[in-house]
From Swiss-Prot:
Protein name: Glycerol kinase
InterPro entries, alphabetized: ATPase_NBD (IPR043129), Carb_kinase_FGGY (IPR000577), Carb_kinase_FGGY_CS (IPR018483), FGGY_C (IPR018485), FGGY_N (IPR018484), Glycerol_kin (IPR005999)
Annotated pathway: Polyol metabolism; glycerol degradation via glycerol kinase pathway; sn-glycerol 3-phosphate from glycerol: step 1/1
Entry GO terms, CC: cytosol
Name of the coding gene: glpK
GO molecular function: ATP binding; glycerol kinase activity
Keyword Signal: no
UniProt source species: Rhodopseudomonas palustris (strain BisA53)
Record bears the keyword Cell cycle: no
EC number(s) on file: 2.7.1.30
Positions that bind ADP: 11, 15, 264, 307, 411
Catalytic activity: glycerol + ATP = sn-glycerol 3-phosphate + ADP + H(+)
Length: 500
């Protein structure tokens, strides 16, 4: 039997999972690390914390599985996307804490770029919008704010990497400075049509080319780990950003297949095949994966509040003590009430992209109580997913010819109530997989594919296992009434926006 180690480096913790060659899990290790908030809207990580927690969990998972380095056929890496690290090419010392994807410190830089009219060019080349979320403006901030950084970068003394790239550099003992196309596509510097770093974008954002890593396929030879780390060298054969890795772990290899991951927020990706689809509905166009030099593209939409709406019920209102209570409580709601929660606690994500809005409840009556609030909170996740679903169908020209298949993962999918309501509102089946560790599985698959122990994508897809399919059971009239009410609630909230 062969084994693959998947490194899943997330925003709040690092995880390592050992998969057997039959895709079953042999061991899991997890370690949380500190978050740093030095100013309002700023979020940072210590690069050494990212590295030490990754190394510790990798060692623990291998030991827990009763294995040694020579038993591991390959390592796959998946990571929090867009987070930026700059480090010294010789010493490996980071010049600053990592700036995390959630960080908003470059808002003014982004506003200036927009006001100067650069967004159409950036969107055309990268598929992204100008937003502090992405890596490019974070790199510029570090070069300009850390004393001497820009001069050092111009002299070729510094390296940039997203978290995957930084971990790869550390794992290989500083021998390999590389990333994959999915991570590169989130930087604002990578042309998703040519598959290259773009000179015009580098000049626009004032980023020296010498900082940037080599861009490889998602399943490729990324070198080997330093033999001193695990008691022997292990080949590193796969890399993908976390949402793309989940898309792969869900075996969404065919155009029209969509995965939606429900955690604190929600990220949905729709495979659109070999041609990038331009969005007219404020979705992102991104690279789903790159295999054998061939890029597969996706439309991506993000929802800021999904599971955090349930956390609000628990921590903010105190009407539940555990997330699992939400569905049964929602079941007790008064069916004659139409309460809508628009959970814009930190603004609305796709397809609205309005950071200024704040949450609101609509349809309250004297009889509205905890059950109705639980009902509204869970339904809000389904309504927001419907908005993404509708935007993707509108953007993708083949939507009428192909049935979109939705596969879900993440902690919130444990709620049967929510998944059934999602199927009802979409009027489409919702598939929950047997293996919930889809992000790590995607990284493991990419590594195992390159190492020759996992099959080609189609065969892997054939082996994908369904745990439960939720089928729509709501009447068309009820669905239409509910969606009309949601649209009215969103319009009502949008009307409160007075601009910046």
């Amino acid at each position: 039997m062969s084994f693959v180690l998947a490194i899943d480096q997330g925003t709040t913790s690092s995880r390592a999972i050992v998969f057997r060659d039959d895709i079953s899990i042999a061991a899991v290790a997890q370690q949380e690390f500190s978050q740093h908030f030095p100013a309002s809207g700023w979020v940072e990580h210590e690069p050494e914390d990212i590295w030490s927690s990754t190394l510790a969990t990798s060692r623990a998972a291998i030991e827990q599985a009763g294995l040694k380095a020579s038993d591991i056929a390959a390592i796959g890496i998946t990571n929090q996307r867009e987070t930026v690290v700059l480090w010294d090419r010789v010493t490996g010392q980071a010049i600053h804490r990592a700036i995390v994807w959630q960080d908003r410190r470059t808002s003014e830089i982004c506003a200036r770029l927009k006001s100067e009219g650069h967004e159409p060019l950036i969107t055309q080349k990268t598929g992204l919008i100008i937003d502090p979320y992405f890596s490019g403006t974070k790199i510029g901030w570090l070069l300009d704010q850390v004393p001497g950084a820009r001069a050092r970068a111009e002299r070729g003394e510094l390296l940039f990497g997203t978290v995957d790239c930084y971990l790869l550099w550390r794992l290989t003992g500083g021998k390999i400075h590389a990333t994959d196309a999915t991570n590169a596509s989130r930087t604002l510097l990578f042309n998703i049509h040519t598959g290259q770093w773009d000179a015009e974008l580098l000049a626009l954002l004032n980023v020296p080319r010498s900082l940037l890593p080599e861009v490889k396929d998602s399943s490729a030879d990324f070198g080997t780990s330093d033999q001193n780390l695990f008691g022997g060298s292990i080949a590193i054969r796969g890399i993908a950003g976390d949402q793309q890795a989940a898309t792969i772990g869900q075996a969404c290899f065919a155009p029209g297949m969509m995965k939606s991951t429900y955690g604190t927020g929600c990220f949905a990706l729709l495979n659109t095949g070999s041609t990038p689809v331009k969005s007219n509905n404020k979705l992102l166009t991104t690279i789903a994966y790159q295999l054998n030099g061939q890029r597969t593209y996706a439309l991506e939409g993000s929802i800021f509040v999904a599971g955090s709406a349930v956390q609000w019920l628990r921590d903010g209102l105190g009407i539940i003590s555990h997330a699992s209570e939400t569905g049964p409580l929602a079941d007790k709601s008064d069916s004659t009430q139409s309460v809508y929660l628009v959970p814009a606690f930190v603004g609305l994500g796709a397809p609205y992209w309005n950071p200024r809005l704040r949450g609101a409840l609509f349809g309250l009556t004297r009889n509205t109580g905890p059950a109705e609030l639980a009902h509204a909170a869970l339904e809000s996740v389904c309504y927001q997913t419907f908005d993404l679903w509708a935007a993707m169908r509108a953007d993708w020209p083949d939507a009428d010819e192909a049935s979109i298949v939705l596969r879900v993962d993440g902690g919130m999918t444990a709620s049967d109530w929510t998944m059934q309501r999602l199927a009802d509102l979409l009027d489409a089946p919702v598939d929950r997989p047997m293996i919930q560790e889809t992000t790590a599985l995607g990284a493991a698959y990419l590594a195992g594919l390159s190492a020759g122990i996992f099959p080609e994508p189609q065969q892997f897809a054939d082996n994908w296992r369904l745990q439960h399919r939720f089928k729509p059971s709501m009447s068309a009239a009820t669905r239409a009434r509910k969606l009309k009410g949601w649209a009215a609630a969103v319009r009502g909230l949008l009307a409160t926006d007075e601009g910046e």
